[in-house]
Amino acid sequence: VKIGCCVSLFHDAVFTLSELGVDYAEIGLSELSLHSGEEISERAERLSEAGVPCLAGNVLFPGELALTGPHTELSAISEYLGATLEKAALLGVRTVVFGSGGSRRAPEGFPREAAWEQLRGLCAELLSPALQKHGMTCCIEPLNRRECNILNTSEECACLVREVGKPNIRLLVDLYHFDLEREPLSVLAGYGDILAHAHIASAKNGRALPKEGDGEDYAAFFQALRSIGYSGSLSLEGSVSGTFEDCIAESAAYVRNFSALKA
């Protein structure tokens, strides 16, 4: 399993990840719209010089871009998506994460079934072809019900992935959201064919990054991943205590111990 770290492309700490024992950066995608291709290419060059691959990106859509409800604008969504993936390609991004709770949230009173169909259509008809152009994969991320009102569990997201039926639309499992939704680890057994990315943080400790003695059973999570043959990417996505460098280095080393264990 490759261990990554979620950090802004425009936070200079991103250039230190290799030194901290991290395999790749996972950057925020929605902020790319605020920067020119030239700026992004310059950051990409510096990442290359620092030996930090930028393999993943999250927050695919900004909160103000509605993906569900009566006021969605497919032309605006398509235009944003095309421009954002073009910029992500400059960085070498291979996996994009579709969490984006603000944009996918169904408006109050809007039928859930209609919102589901909008998201299914978005993934199948807009997102999948746009990804194919760049050889990217999108992983749908379950978000706990405090953050969004649709696609809250891995089971729901897996159902959507299978309904879409596209090889570049896959599933992400985030241990933080997984635990808040009280999903049993046993459900992971059914995702061996669609799981393509993972996030990790502690639900018991306010989304803090994993560290020894924090009360979480990370061994069971990694055992469940190993049992389905998962050997992909897993990103640290949580709050930092102390200095960024010390916290990331400690957490990456701790998590890597679990990922290296044999089944």
Predicted regions and their residues:
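Glycine-rich, proline-tolerant flexible connector loops at the mouths of alpha/beta enzymes
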Residues: 27-47, 100-107
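Active-site acidic/histidine proton-transfer and metal-coordination neighborhood
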Residues: 49, 67-170
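Histidine-acidic metal/acid-base catalytic patches
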Residues: 2, 10-21, 77-78, 86-94, ...
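Active-site beta-loop-alpha junctions enriched in small/polar residues
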Residues: 6-10, 28-32, 59-62, 101-103, ...
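Short, structured active-site "lid" loops
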Residues: 51-54
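Basic, amphipathic N-terminal segments that precede the first structured/catalytic domain
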Residues: 14-34
